[in-house]
């Protein structure tokens, strides 16, 4: 899980979602998981 100020899709499989008021990226590739900090 990467925590960064701006989250971007890293591939076509990435999905940007909102959980508990936080913007997150979920993907089949676990390296692409991100959360806005």
UniProtKB/Swiss-Prot annotation:
The cellular component terms of Gene Ontology attached to this UniProt record, alphabetical and capped at eight, are:
chloroplast; ribonucleoprotein complex; ribosome
Official protein name in the record: Large ribosomal subunit protein bL36c
Keywords attached to this Swiss-Prot or TrEMBL record, sorted alphabetically, are: Chloroplast, Plastid, Ribonucleoprotein, Ribosomal protein
Query: What SUPFAM superfamilies does the entry give?
Result: Ribosomal protein L36
Where does this polypeptide localize?
Plastid, Chloroplast
One of the record's GO molecular function terms: structural constituent of ribosome
InterPro entries linked: Ribosomal_bL36, Ribosomal_bL36_sp
UniProt similarity note: Belongs to the bacterial ribosomal protein bL36 family.
Q: NCBIfam families of this UniProt entry? A: rpmJ_bact
Q: What is its main location?
A: plastid
One GO-annotated biological process of the protein: translation
């Amino acid at each position: 899980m990467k925590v960064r100020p701006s989250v971007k899709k890293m591939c076509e499989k990435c999905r940007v979602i909102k959980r508990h008021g936080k913007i997150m990226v979920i993907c089949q590739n676990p390296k692409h998981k991100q959360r806005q900090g």
